[in-house]
Amino acid sequence: MRKTLLISFIVPAFNAQSTLTGCVRSIVRTMSSCRSNYEIIIVDDGSADDTPRLAQSLAEEIEEVTVVTQENRGLGAARNHGIDEANGLYVAFVDADDEIKASGIVDFSLLNGSFDILCIPILRVTSKGKTSVYGSTTQRIPFGKRFDEARDYLRHRNVIPCACAYLWRRETLLTRFHEDIYHEDEEFTVMSLLHGGTLICTNQLFTYKYICRPDSITTSSENAGKRLADIATIIGRLETYASAHPEQKRYMRTKLLWLHIDYLRQRLRYHR
């Protein structure tokens, strides 16, 4: 029987030799008061650089780290693989080029199974080291706010789409990431919130540090065409779901509107 842990941190890694070690060590530092009750699952997504060796070295050094490998199938597939391997009561996603840091007050008792989803702060860090709170202009939800149904958090709100902004109770996480597309978080997060139970917004666990890099998949102009096409695909899939499930449509309207706005912004940005 597999031991049930508190949190499974899923770290997809593709050609991440320059950032993987910093990412993993940030998790270890953050969880220092909860040692041996968590795991870090590095999913090597067919890396062609030194990532596999670094991952194995970290696993040999840190007992909470395990490594699984797959052929290069993309971020969504790597996250799905990690979910299948996870043993934690909760699942947290941390991209290999990002980090986390402990909050001033850490209260792991929040992770007692009472909440299906916990929304945590995201700090955007630029390449010059400037920081800002990600999503602060669209969220406006006080920490400690609870929702009996996660879809009430989604309603009338342009929720942060990043799956890394939430901890997900593994047993209730029914949605999987759509593979082979960019912006897979947009669909995953909406569908997970629609079907999730209790949700709380908290700053008493840890903060996710989203480190902006000019060469990342979601910012590089080289991928603009595919990103636009994939946003359109996601909008189409969500609208199809909304049409088939009218009882859910009212919870999706605001997010769908913002997705359309984002699509138009991207077109104007890259197709002037």
Language-model regions, residue ranges each:
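Short, well-formed alpha-helical segments that are part of the catalytic scaffolds
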Residues: 16-31
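Acidic helix N-cap motif at the loop->helix transition within catalytic regions
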Residues: 18-22, 49-58, 99, 103
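Short aromatic/hydrophobic "clamp" motif used to bind/position activated sugar donors
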Residues: 91
